[in-house]
Amino acid sequence: MLAAASRTTMLGIPDSGQLVAALTGLGEEDEHIRDAGRVGTPHTYGSFLPIYGDLPPLSVTVVQETLPLPEGGDHPVPPKKTIDVAPLLPEHADQPVVTNNSATTRPQLCAPYDDDIEATLRAMETNPAERPSPYFLETTQGGRMTALVRASMIAFMDEFSRFYELADGTLQRAAYFLDRYLSVTPESDDVLQLRLVGATAVFLAAKYEDQYTLRKIDASMVAARCGYTSETRHKMVSCMETEILAALDYNLSGPTASTFVQHFTRYYGDGKEEELLKEAAHRFTDGSLLTYGFHRYLPSVVAASAIFLARLHVLGHEPWSRDLAELTGYEAIDLMGCVCDMYSQIACPRFAPFQVCEHVPDSSHVSADHEEVESSLQFVSAEHGNPAG
């Protein structure tokens, strides 16, 4: 145990003690939070906005030519007219607008829409019609599919999406489609059929995320990737698309964890550290797809937990702040269950976020260090429970 702890310290990996302190201590954060290392919104958005300046009121002079005098008349020439025109831009147009429910350090560039988008995403993620069944493997599938088989499908879907370099967010949405489909449709254990379901879910998700997907891949290529070689293989993909769409009731727009990661980091800049944080958060959310049970958490909870661990991984300190709590709607203590479950799936937190899902997790290959991490996180209350199926 001590040797493992020493190795953890030498590698710079945050131990469970740091995780406990981060989760339990940040709820009492005072006004003396260090600004150094905080990744929040820029203090000013001046460099990101066009510099319009304050334009003075415009004055347009309309000059009318002198009209010839009519015969027998003596009319005066019409005088010059000055028309006052309102400024093209309001004063201080280069200043961002901040609404009442926003942190003062977080400017909103689209104030009339930002709050509406937030409310819409929150409503959609809690809509039962747009959520997978909590225990679809035990109920709908009736034991015909195990958590390991589902993980194998996710791994195949990940490899499929990376092979064709499909749009970001495709894997998250494809897994969302898959879980909703399996929640209402009993599936066989035929390998080719399962591959067809997974690949078609990726195909649908890719077309949803990127309108130019068909320039990269078509139905015949999807079927061939699954192992089908007949001349009419594209029809199998089309039929499966129709079946999945019907199972989803043609509702494809539910937010995923990836959606909320993008939403919560929308004020990040283009700095190296901020890009690293976003990449790590996306890798954490993608890694959670392999474990059956994370779908029971709301996507916003999974996204916020991934950002928490990404900040702990990249910054090494201050994984949460008042601005993040206000932005996400979650205090650090609210994320305890999901953070600990996500943390327990990572054998080496320092490097795991940058390893793509290339294998199916097998409990027989869990390292001794990983077991020690799991045992050290037993402070989690029973109500949070490990979602792993």
Swiss-Prot record:
Species in which this protein is naturally found: Oryza sativa subsp. japonica
Name listed for the protein in its UniProt record: Putative cyclin-F1-3
Example GO BP: G1/S transition of mitotic cell cycle
Pfam families registered for this protein in UniProt: Cyclin_C, Cyclin_N
UniProt entry keywords in alphabetical sequence: Cell cycle, Cell division, Cyclin
PANTHER family on file: CYCLINS (PTHR10177)
Gene3D superfamilies named among the record's database cross-references: Cyclin-like (1.10.472.10)
MF GO annotations: cyclin-dependent protein serine/threonine kinase regulator activity
Matching InterPro entries: Cyclin, Cyclin-like_dom, Cyclin-like_sf, Cyclin_C-dom, Cyclin_N
Assigned protein family: Belongs to the cyclin family. Cyclin F subfamily.
Source species, domain of life: Eukaryota
